[in-house]
Amino acid sequence: MGKIIGIDLGTTNSCVAILEGNTPKVIENSEGARTTPSIIAYMEDGEILVGAPAKRQAVTNPRNTLYAVKRLIGRKFEEKEVQKDIGLMPYSIVKADNGDAWVSVRDQKLAPPQVSAEVLRKMKKTAEDYLGEPVTEAVITVPAYFNDSQRQATKDAGRIAGLDVKRIINEPTAAALAFGMDKNEKGDRKIAVYDLGGGTFDISIIEIADVDGEKQFEVLSTNGDTFLGGEDFDQRIIDYIISEFKKDQGVDLSKDVLALQRLKEAAEKAKIELSSSQQTEINLPYITADASGPKHLNLKMTRAKLESLVEELITRTIEPCRIAIKDAGVKVSDIDDVILVGGMTRMPKVQEQVKEFFGKEARKDVNPDEAVAVGAAIQGSVLSGDRTDVLLLDVTPLSLGIETLGGVMTKMITKNTTIPTKHAQVFSTADDNQPAVTIKVFQGEREMASGNKLLGEFNLEGIPPAARGTPQIEVSFDIDANGILHVGAKDKATGKENRITIKANSGLSEDEIQRMVKDAEANAEEDKKARELADARNQADALIHSTKKALTEYGDKLEAGEKEKIEAAIKELEDAARGGDKAEIDAKVNALSEVSQKLGEKVYADMQAKAGEGATAGAAAGAGAAGGQQAQPQDDNVVDAEFKEVNDKK
């Protein structure tokens, strides 16, 4: 059985880890970095770039370079958060036939799980290159506050990438695993994991206990905001730069897609620099042009200015912390450790606010970029049976229920219930002789169902005629360890039953997932062909170069006809190398190798002759030296050299 890898599929960056023995290992990607930008670019020739190569070309290809796609995963197009992003993203967000938010690149509509699958494929390949064996199973992390549709969509992305997703695990819980397994502190500890990433915010209160030699991680409560993160901080900086430039130059950069992409890069860079310095300079020459000529952007920005721009965003993270503490039934003073996760927690102002709320400094010994992937890898080793000393008890982040008479949300499973869990309740009909009931499943905290998220609906038909309130219909809710919901309804009189795994009334159908899996496999085949073609071209170039060089040096030793044949074969190979037919290139490589055989023989003979001359000259010199030595009187008193052994091993 192969290893189950741990993947942190982030909004801005992603990371992959494994467990070697009991030691977690974050794996470096093909560019040598431990994290990979979650950026995907679709090129004109059909090539798909992922990570740093995609990020590098974003400025020149903004409409076809996708980033922060995780913010769209499992979401409807009409949701206000999606509508807000439409005006901000340089790429096109469109409405799918099922009402979901999809993206459009190069006249092609793509589902967010399909795009995220490209990042997961890169993570999978990174692990395979390191392990030297195929990887088919993974634990993937999601924000704790992700709802059912978002979890389901993440699982779909894994399938499209060719991974069997063994478990979906919450990011703060994964970070707690990484922290807890790394520490040898005994006794029970309550920790707060404050996770502010690129696109989402989570806070979880977790109890770590030692139970009979095994570490038990119990999530007491979780809260958050799935549309608050580093991308929003970047946007505040971008808006500020645009307004300052408009004041200064009278030009609105928000209408210029290329300029926006450059501003995005500059904003991210400024934000990072201001975490370690008090001031930075945003310098973008030739940012745009008007009738008077090119315009340059030069703007100084202080840390204080940045903090004033994003203060409201940081404050928004504190209310979920309050709710999480209350839901966990603990006091702020009961928290032993505060752990910061996500790149945004490097910002001094964020650390300051967290310290102010919890009354203590956050731990500095947890890597905010890598802890989540490490925790996922630990959970992978638990699932594969390699580790038996860890027990993880997670919770469902939001209440689940059904719509009952009057549009009321009747909660079946309340938020922060430990999962997996089951709950059943008996309901009845609202009308006389009602032949069927529609079960509408919602997720959320509002009293009325319409204020919550509809996850799905199904019918239970064939109910025998009876007065209203007489039939006994048992509705059962069952949440698995991934936090994914299965709902059933049963007429107790007839035994008739209907069950569904909640696939949001949007989401991808099985057929769509299968098609995307096939597309991904075809892409992998295309990638392989492209690599083989590149190798063939490299081989052709090397042969052309060496043959031309030999022809320059030794061509005059060949007959005119032979030389012409070689030159013609070189020309044919050059033409073939410019095309895209690997078989044609291989054939022309063989043809050139064959006709230049005579030339090769001439080169070889010449080298042998030179080597022979060198050897003869060397032998003569050697003989001279030997003769000189014989003229010296022989000294028979050979003295043994003294030596002593030095032992370097300390």
UniProtKB/Swiss-Prot annotation:
Q: Where is this region: Disordered?
A: 612-650
Give this protein's Gene Ontology molecular function annotations: ATP binding; ATP-dependent protein folding chaperone; unfolded protein binding
Q: Which Pfam families match?
A: HSP70
Q: Which domain of life is it from?
A: Bacteria
Query: What gene makes this protein?
Result: dnaK
Q: Which UniProt keywords apply?
A: ATP-binding, Chaperone, Nucleotide-binding, Phosphoprotein, Stress response
Recorded family membership: Belongs to the heat shock protein 70 family.
Q: Which InterPro entries match?
A: ATPase_NBD, Chaperone_DnaK, Heat_shock_70_CS, HSP70_C_sf, HSP70_peptide-bd_sf, Hsp_70_fam
Q: What is this protein called?
A: Chaperone protein DnaK
Tell me which positions the record assigns to the signal sequence: none
Q: Does the keyword Transferase apply?
A: no
The modified positions for Phosphothreonine read T200
Q: Could you read off the lineage of the organism from its UniProt record?
A: Bacteria, Pseudomonadati, Pseudomonadota, Betaproteobacteria, Burkholderiales
